[in-house]
Amino acid sequence: MWEQRRQKVVFSLTILVRYRLKQSMAKKISKNSRAARQSDALEPEVKDLSELPRAEKTDLTNILIRTAAKNEALLEAKISKKANKSKRGKKLNKKALEDKLANSISSMDRDRLVKALNFTNRLDGKIAKSISRAKYIQNTRKAGWDSTNETIKKELAFLNGGLSVQAKSASEGNAEKEDEEIPEVFDSLAEDNTVQKTPTNRFGVLPDDVEE
């Protein structure tokens, strides 16, 4: 029984292989063959239709409408982007805040604007202080030690109220007196030196012995 089944399977496989070989070895119908010429003669319209160009859409209204809408949307997006950039780049000045405060209606907006105005005032003061500090540091770095010391002394004098006119005159008088006293001291020292240098007779101290 198994042998019969095996023989049937082998037989069917051989038939299938032969059929495939026939198909592969079969010649293709050439254009110049009788069958090809007969088919062309029977169906001339098919050849004409195959040679015709492909039909194209002539109605372009839909495409134009879409492109116009797209361009309009892009233009609006560009304009809104520029407006947002300009709003972000603008700084709120004191005058602009005051005008907005005057035109504000609700109390909440008024309170917010008052806070913003106070903040801008403080910020302006801080900016001015930082600018002056930066200039002072640059000048001190460029200048020498003598000029920096002089500027520090002037600033300290200005902070302490400055030197009074009487103090200045007293200091000038003391300086003049010191200048006058210096040559007198030198003269007295010179006289002392001359006195010390004069020779003294040591035998003059002894008593005179008179012979009688």
Swiss-Prot record:
Subcellular localization: Nucleus, Nucleolus; Nucleus; Cytoplasm
Highest taxon listed in the record's lineage: Eukaryota
Main subcellular location: nucleus
Modified residues (Phosphoserine): S188
UniProt keyword annotations, A-Z: Cytoplasm, Nucleus, Phosphoprotein, Ribosome biogenesis, Transport
A Pfam family recorded for this sequence: Alb1
Disordered: annotated span: 28-48, 188-212
UniProt record, GO biological process: ribosomal large subunit export from nucleus
Similarity comment: family membership: Belongs to the ECM1 family.
Note: Present with 2840 molecules/cell in log phase SD medium.
Assembly description: Associates with the pre-60S ribosomal particle and the nucleopore complex.
Protein name per its UniProtKB record: Shuttling pre-60S factor ECM1
Organism annotation: Saccharomyces cerevisiae (strain ATCC 204508 / S288c)
